[in-house]
Amino acid sequence: METLHHPLVKMEEDYALSSDSEPNSTCMANTWDWKSHNESYSLSQTPSPQSVSPAASYESTYSSSPHTGQGLEEMPFSYSLLQYPTLCHGDNGALTKKDHGHKTSMTTHRRRKASEREKLRMRAIAEALHTLRNNLPPMYSQGRQPLTKIQTLKCTINYISELTNLLQCSKRA
């Protein structure tokens, strides 16, 4: 804010001096007329929008004070580089990952481990159900289609109940 204040005060002084001395002065018009300069720009003269702060965007090396003969480039202004957060641009992806890398990697690692455990658990359940289906008598199967998980469990419960009843009947006799 301080760097913006000084150029504005200087412009106010220049305007007051030029308007007090001659009301129809062309001095002010020459100072602000961008078409009056016939010099061409090169890439080295044109600052990039990311390297100059917005406060200094109106200050050009071609503006000069009409009464002092001193250009703005000779005045002590500071141009500050803008620092944008890395999350906004994502230009520095490695740095963004480093900031949260440990936590993210641990979460990802835990998720992968849990996924592996779940796969192994589901594989074990599938093998057990396959074994049950193979050990059920053919009368419990539905022909060509394999039993679903629920059907397999229900048929197994019925089969075990029948076997239990047979054992109890044989013990009584």
From Swiss-Prot:
Ribonucleoprotein among keywords: no
Molecular-function GO term, any one: DNA-binding transcription factor activity, RNA polymerase II-specific
Comp. bias intervals (Basic residues): 99-114
Region (Disordered): 39-69, 96-117
Record's subcellular location: Nucleus
Biased composition (Polar residues): 39-68
PROSITE patterns in alphabetical order: BHLH (PS50888)
Keywords tagged on the record: Developmental protein, Differentiation, DNA-binding, Nucleus, Transcription, Transcription regulation
GO BP terms, alphabetized: cell differentiation; mesoderm formation; regulation of transcription by RNA polymerase II
Physiological role: Involved in specifying the paraxial, but not dorsal, mesoderm. May regulate the expression of T-box transcription factors required for mesoderm formation and differentiation, such as brachyury T, wnt8, vegt and eomes.
Identification of the protein by name: Mesogenin-1
Taxonomic source organism: Xenopus laevis (African clawed frog)
UniProt gene name: msgn1
